Design a protein with these regions (language model features):
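Short beta-strand edge/turn micro-motifs at domain boundaries
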Residues: 123-160, 265-291
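Hydrophobic/aromatic beta-strand elements that line small-molecule binding cavities or substrate pockets
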Residues: 77-79, 91-96, 108-111, 125-132, ...
Length: 293
């Protein structure tokens, strides 16, 4: 009888431990929803308190913005006055890491000098990297965008991508080594032909962002835009970060593009993500030339 009781208590204990472990597992879908909710609160704060106040509230202390190169976002917005500038945006695509602490979203944006203006004077797309903070809040780690023509089609609905469960745990150091090796191969290939290099390492649904164009989604759609700006490209990385689950990463920095018309200098930003086989793929590519003086 005593042995039976001990076995029963041991079984209950192991069951409770199992349930606690399962409860502690990160939920990427729930995290993606929280991230998108933070994005919408970011926008709502801008509508209620002003764009400057919104950026200062939702940027991480080390968050990056591009003006045109990478700068500390809080320092940039802290120096700007609140002008009434009206910035409207809505996330239409979101992706989350397996560790549920690191994700990104993107979508259309439009702006005007203030709400008194009848028409919006500019249209574009934003891309934001979000990271979960120690206090459980979500903050913007990096924010950038492009300008494009005024859209004429129906507004997109939100699409959310989260990774599936792995059969075996991922070793962080091994994944980091694989990421660095993959990106090194990409940069070497780009020195010969940037378009071919991008398509070679791209995910099937890569998103390519260039000023003056709507985002190109998918290899076939991206090919003409990549070909139009192709050249012999060299990269100088200035910053990078990766999720704790080692399945989502970004890099940014400077580039030099040698083309027939001359050499173009600019800044780049890329998001890399592992596929089902654990191979690193380029899922988002943004590049912007430095404005001519």
């Amino acid at each position: 009888m005593q042995l039976h009781r001990r076995s029963l208590w041991l079984g209950l204990f192991l069951l409770s431990v199992s349930l606690c472990v399962r409860a502690a597992e990160p939920d990427p879908l729930e995290a993606a929803r929280a991230m998108v909710d933070a994005e919408r609160k970011f926008y709502q704060t801008g509508q209620e308190q002003g764009t400057r106040a919104a950026f200062l509230a939702f940027l991480a202390d080390d968050g990056i913005v591009f003006r045109p190169g990478p700068l500390n976002g809080k320092e940039v917005w802290g120096k700007r006055p609140e002008t009434g500038f009206d910035l409207v945006w809505e996330p239409t695509f979101a992706a989350m890491s397996r560790s549920a602490d690191f994700g990104y979203d993107t979508g259309p944006a439009k702006w005007r000098a203030n709400k008194k203006e009848e028409k919006f004077t500019g249209h574009g797309q934003f891309v934001s990297i979000w990271k979960k903070q120690k206090d459980g809040s979500w903050k913007v780690a990096l924010d950038l965008g492009i300008e494009n023509p005024e859209p004429t089609g129906k507004p997109e609905t939100l699409r959310t991508i989260v990774p599936g469960k792995l059969k075996e745990p991922v070793n962080f150091d091994t994944a980091e080594k694989s990421r660095l090796e993959t990106q090194q191969k990409f940069t070497q290939a780009a020195r010969t032909d940037s378009a071919l290099a991008t398509l070679k390492f791209a995910a099937p649904e890569i998103r390519v962002y260039r000023d003056g164009h709507f985002p190109s989604i998918g290899k076939d759609a991206a090919r003409p835009l990549l070909d139009a700006t192709a050249g012999r490209v060299t990269f100088e990385m200035l910053g990078a970060d990766m999720s704790r689950s080692a399945d989502l990463s970004y890099t940014y920095g400077k580039y030099s593009n040698v083309r027939r018309k001359g050499t173009e200098q600019g800044h780049y930003f890329q998001i890399w993500q592992t596929d089902a086989a654990g191979t690193w793929k380029l899922v988002l590519d943004w590049a912007q030339p430095v404005p001519e003086k």
